[in-house]
Structures are given as C-alpha cells and as structure tokens.
C-alpha cells in the first residue's frame, strides 16, 4: 500500500483535462453570479427547474444514498463484513450532499437567502422546508460520520474516539433523515398532476423515490468501489482488497431484490391507474426503455452475476443501475414534465448549464481523490486498527 506520492508528476492527461474543466467552470460561475441566471441558462416561467435540479440535486441526492445504505448494513444490521465499504461510501455521500448544496446556489435567484427557511421564514407546511431541513441536518450528520478519517489523519485521537462512540446514533439519524427527504423529493411532484405525464405521475411517487434511492445507493457503492479498485488500488490495504468482492456480491444480491420489487410496484401502479393505453405512444416507448432496460435488465444481471459468481456482470449491472436512476430523475423532472407543451416551448439545457454541472461532478471527483490519497478512507490507519 502506497499513500500520496509527492514526487509523481501532476502533468498527466487526466489532471490536465480536470484542470481545464475546473477553470472553465470557474469562468461560468463568475458569469452566473455577475450576469444572472438568464445569461447562462434556458430556464423560463414554463421551465423553472432544469438540469441543476434534475441532475445536480435529484440525481446527486439519490446517488449519495450509498452512505445510509452501507452504514445501516454494517452498524444496524450487523453485517460487519461490509465495514471496509463504510468510509468510502460515507465520503462519497458527504461530498455528494455538500456539492448538492453548492449546486443549489446556482439555481437560486437569491443564493444568499438559502438559509432563510431554517432561520427566518420556516414555512413548516411546505415540503421544500422539510427537504431543506433534512438535507441540512443530514449533511451535518455525514460530516460527523466522515470526520474520524480526518481526525486520524491529523492525529487527534481523543476527539476521534469521542466521535466514533456516536456511530450508532449517527447511523440511526442518517437512516431516518434519508427516508424523509428521499421520499419528499418525490412528493414535490404530487402537486403537478396535470404537468407530469401519467406514466410517471403517481400518488406513490414518494415511495418510488425512496425505494429507487436504495437501488442508487447499492449500485453506486459497487460502481464507485470498482473505479477505486482500478484507479486507487495501490492505496488499499489487505482488508479492503480481501473484502472488496464480498461487498460486490452482497450489495449486488440486495440490489437485485430491490429492483425486482421496484419493478413490480411500478407495474401495479400503472395497472391501478389504468394507464396501459399510454404505452402505445412515444412516451410509452420511453417508459418501457426505462423499466425494461434500466430496471428489469439490471435486476436480472445482478441475480445472474451473484449466482454464477461473475463479478464483471455485477459491475456492469451497477452501471445500468446508476444510469437508470439518472434516467428516472431526468424523466420525472424534465422529459415527462410539461409534456403537453409544444416542442418549441419545451426545455433544453444551455451549454453553460451543462458546463456547470460537469464542473460540479469534476469537483466532487477531484476532492474525493485528494481525500482518499491522504486520509485513511481506502485503508485502515495502522494506529487505529483495533479502535473501532
């Protein structure tokens, strides 16, 4: 195992591309906050939410669900064999939620008023208040859950030991808060039955969003672990290397069952609402692509990979699972929203909107690499191996 190599050249193709994206992102950020939202986006009165909400927020929150899924598996359900996956998952979740809040500032007309719902005008009957309160609280919980890695790196043993004793309480808080805001993000669309296509609109949207967040968390842990195993293999210790395949098989099995259940309740929902006739339309074909290609197929591939012990199949299924979550959030927030409007009034993101979203994702990856290459995330600190 090797840690950060300060002698290694920073002028690699990957770092150069990353640097270009970050510089362009900073330029677009300056334009956004000096010229206004209209200068860098195609948002309007018909389409007030674009990819900054549909991708950066809805997808970001869902894909960061690996934090509560992994910590609950290890600390609440006693599956200690997944302990090595907890810190990478918590780190990803913490960065995901942190940059969700960062990205939200781009979408707000008055970014400085972001804390208003918490400290000035609560609006306690609003779902957005509940989402904002839960996300802010859960971000704090994630920071505390992640902090032992930083404290071990800094050598602050006493503070670290105090924080570790709070693990179980923090995990319970994390699961409760995640259940609330993951489902509430789906509930936001309940107020727009005439704007959201019937195949995606349902009174069970909160349930769908929560269950699909579990799929996102399980798939993201496998996907992220596969990337880390390939690109940061030299930073892992023997425990992480030995337990990596077990995490893939265990989470793959769980994802297969959750996806199968999700598929069944989606079919039941369409049946209850008598929406089958919409399948003969273009939107119906797109719904079938989502359900068959990114729900049923990955569920089958997860089951096949686990049964046949084919780790490559499971990793491919995790890619489909992640893409399926992105596709679902895009469909609900963008593609199937305002479906009745003429084509010339529909929303398509400005290239600067896309550029800012790419900047946010690149920032997450860059910060994760910085943390993982210096702090005990992919390995156990030798001074704390017996102090869990």
From Swiss-Prot:
HMWC (high-molecular-weight cytochrome c), ORF2, ORF3, ORF4, ORF5 and ORF6 in the HMC operon form a transmembrane protein complex that allows electron flow from the periplasmic hydrogenase to the cytoplasmic enzymes that catalyze reduction of sulfates. The chain crosses the membrane at residues 10-31, 57-78, 89-106, 130-144, 166-191, 199-222, 254-265, 291-306, 316-328, 354-368. Pfam families: NrfD. It is found in: Cell membrane. One of its GO terms (biological process) is anaerobic respiration. It comes from Nitratidesulfovibrio vulgaris (strain ATCC 29579 / DSM 644 / CCUG 34227 / NCIMB 8303 / VKM B-1760 / Hildenborough). Belongs to the NrfD family. The keyword RNA-binding does not apply. It comes from the Bacteria. Its main location: membrane. This is Protein DVU_0534. Signal peptide: none annotated. GO terms for cellular component: plasma membrane. The keyword Cell membrane applies. It is a multi-pass membrane protein. Keywords: Cell membrane, Membrane, Transmembrane, Transmembrane helix.
């Amino acid at each position: 195992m090797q840690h950060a190599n300060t002698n290694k050249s920073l002028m690699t193709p990957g770092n150069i591309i990353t640097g270009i994206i970050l510089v362009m992102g900073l330029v677009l950020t300056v334009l956004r906050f000096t010229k206004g939202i209209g200068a860098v986006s195609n948002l309007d009165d018909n389409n007030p939410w674009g990819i900054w909400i549909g991708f950066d927020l809805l997808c970001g929150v869902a894909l960061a669900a690996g934090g509560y899924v992994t910590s609950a598996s290890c600390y609440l359900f006693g599956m200690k064999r997944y302990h090595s996956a907890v810190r990478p998952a918590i780190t990803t979740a913490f960065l995901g939620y942190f940059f969700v809040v960062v990205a939200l500032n781009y979408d707000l007309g008055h970014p400085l008023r972001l804390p208003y719902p918490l400290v000035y005008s609560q609006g306690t009957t609003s779902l957005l208040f509940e989402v904002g309160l839960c996300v802010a609280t859960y971000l704090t919980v994630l920071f505390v859950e992640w902090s032992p890695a930083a404290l071990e790196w800094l050598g602050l043993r006493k503070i670290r030991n105090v924080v570790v004793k709070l693990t179980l309480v923090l995990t319970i808080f994390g699961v409760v808060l995640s259940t609330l805001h993951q489902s509430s993000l789906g509930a936001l669309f309940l107020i727009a039955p005439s704007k959201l296509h019937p195949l995606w609109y349902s009174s069970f949207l909160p349930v769908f969003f929560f269950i699909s967040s579990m799929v996102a968390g399980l798939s993201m842990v496998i996907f992220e672990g596969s990337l880390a195993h390939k690109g940061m293999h030299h930073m892992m210790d023997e425990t992480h290397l030995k337990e990596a395949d077990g995490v893939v098989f265990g989470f793959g099995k769980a994802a297969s069952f959750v996806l199968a259940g999700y598929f069944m309740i989606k079919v039941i929902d369409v049946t209850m609402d008598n929406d089958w006739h919409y399948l003969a339309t273009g939107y119906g074909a797109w719904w079938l692509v989502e359900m068959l290609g990114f729900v049923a197929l990955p569920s089958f591939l997860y089951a096949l990979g686990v049964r046949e012990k084919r780790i490559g199949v499971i990793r491919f299924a995790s890619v489909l699972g992640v893409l399926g979550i992105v596709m679902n959030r895009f469909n609900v927030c963008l593609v199937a929203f305002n479906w009745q409007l003429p084509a010339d009034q529909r929303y398509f993101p400005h290239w600067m909107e896309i550029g800012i979203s790419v900047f946010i994702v690149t920032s997450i990856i860059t910060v994760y690499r910085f943390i993982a290459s210096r702090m005990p995330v992919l390995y156990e600190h030798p001074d704390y191996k017996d102090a869990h």
